[in-house]
A protein has these predicted regions:
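GAF sensory/regulatory domain recognition
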Residues: 53-56, 65-90
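A short, aliphatic-rich beta-strand micro-motif
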Residues: 125-134, 138
Length: 179
């Protein structure tokens, strides 16, 4: 009888794994880590480094770029990149990139898992376009390029992390307005 009570109190690790509880905690920890890293960035350079760390360690790509919005010219200019050829991806013209319009409205855009669709007019696979909001307005867009080979696509937890990037990475592009 005592043994039966104990099994109700403490589930086995296998049972927790089966029900998804361990995965949920892992996902929450990733989202928390991303938010904490961005909020504790000490300056603009550290905030940009935080974006790189989050993209590489939590989402699964070492090819990431940040483009600042030039509203007057309807273009996005490469502001910072890691693992991306800056000569190949220096300017994004909004009129030639229909998916960018959604990002410039403040909505992240994701490539479907195992899809050949590309989010930008480039030979390099683009998996996400994540707006960086400053005072609720897109000031820049994070472009997540090729994922690690073991990742089939952007997972639900990755979308949550991208939401954190969208709302907390403003310091990387507007260091004096976003704190």
């Amino acid at each position: 009888m005592f043994r039966g009570c104990m099994s109700n109190i403490s589930d086995s690790p296998a049972e927790l794994e089966r029900t998804g509880s361990i995965r949920d905690v892992g996902s929450q920890a990733k989202v928390y880590a991303a938010r904490l890293r961005l909020q504790n960035a000490i300056d603009q350079a550290d905030a940009l480094d935080a974006i790189r760390e989050i993209a590489g360690n939590l989402i699964g790509t070492e090819e990431v770029a940040v483009y600042k919005v030039d509203k007057k010219r309807s273009e996005l200019w490469l502001y910072w990149a890691f693992g991306v050829d800056p000569n190949k991806h220096s300017v994004l013209v909004v009129s030639r990139e229909p998916k960018l319009k959604q990002a410039l409205k403040g909505k992240a855009v994701y490539r479907l898992k195992l899809s050949n669709e590309n989010l930008l007019c480039t030979d390099d696979p683009v998996n996400a376009l994540v707006p960086i909001l400053v005072d609720g307005v897109p000031a820049a867009v994070i472009v997540l390029f090729r994922l690690f080979p073991h990742k089939p696509g952007i997972e639900p937890v990755d979308r949550e992390i991208c939401e954190v990037l969208s709302n907390c990475a403003g310091r990387a592009v507007e260091p004096y307005r976003s704190r």
